[in-house]
UniProtKB/Swiss-Prot annotation:
Subcellular compartments: Secreted
GO cellular component, one term: extracellular region
Species for this entry: Periplaneta americana
Residues modified to Asparagine amide: 11
Name this polypeptide is given: Periviscerokinin-1
Length: 11
């Protein structure tokens, strides 16, 4: 979700 910016939100 965070386009890879946040490790747990790599969606």
């Amino acid at each position: 979700g965070a386009s890879g910016l946040i490790p747990v939100m790599r969606n």
